[in-house]
Amino acid sequence: MNLYKVGCNFDWKLLDAIQELNEKYKGKAQVVELFGSDSDHEELTARPGWRLPKFDQNFFEAYIKKAKDMGLKFNYTMNSIQPYGSKMNMIAHKKEIQDYVKWLEEIGVYRITIANPMMAMFIREVSNIELEISCISHIDTVTQFKYFHEQFGINKFCCSILKNRNKEFLTRAAKYCNEHGIILEMLAQEFCGVAGVDENGNPYATHCAFRDSCYLCHATNRTKFESMEYHNYPMGFCMSARNSTPESWLRMRWIRPEDQKLYNSIGINYFKLSGRTGTTEYLTYIMDAYMGENFEGNLLTLWKPLETITTGEKELSHKHLVNIPNKKLDGFLDKWFKGDGWECENHMCGEDCKYCYEFTKKYINNSDN
């Protein structure tokens, strides 16, 4: 059975939607965990405060209680790469952080997601609350799972999206995690990456060159104005890059609803569905697709369009520049998961390999979409 952690927008209707979907997919798939944070603690999280909900402690406590009564665990995100902007500022706020952790534990928060190991050190001085390592930390080696588990008692990891199609890494990581009672979680609908066309006309793409810089900006920007400065750096750059060619999107590290079985086959059944700043309508749309392992439509609608962050447009109303019929991608991931697999990070995209380009040319550009 597939299990899901879902982004929480703190809408009461989201809990109702989860309850209905859990009943609909009972025995096959279940949402078991929510994740999110609030604007008053923007210094701790990987999202600027203007994108986060604001609420008082009474509301938060009531929401956690309702979720807990439904059997949902709440995961509070303290996943800033550098909380408070520097090590010294972080140290200056150490007691404040620790007091907040103790309060979160008191009201029923089950787990905290971190991206900075120093946060684990602070938390472990006062609490044995469950911890998760964020995908922002980009765990790049199998042995890192062991280190974080043994040193800090961390029992859950969101896998680096760079590794989403690395069969050998995932197989070995899943083996270690399953043998040691650790949850290995895959971020399903993340399309981060950059792309271009070289001087010879070869289109290429790669894991996002802006990713760490992006999360530093998220963590330190305070207002929408700050986020939009310097041509909406960095998101303005990666958005335009991905739209350079249709096949750029195929080169990103997404996992379709239908592809989950490939991960099940190597021992992974826990998936993260992002979108905590999205609408309940959008989150319900995403949950239904993944829990049902079936999706009809444009692949790109599985990800919250970055453009909607600043425009306020509803996700499902957004007009994408590229249409990639999801069902045309059946079998697409076989290149990475059949036989010995394929590791894009070890090759020059567009030169050593043109698989995505050829696939797009054959199945996408010529489809009736």
Across the structure, where does each feature detected by a protein language model lie?
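Active-site pocket-lining/capping segments in soluble small-molecule metabolic enzymes
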Residues: 1-147, 154-272, 276-369
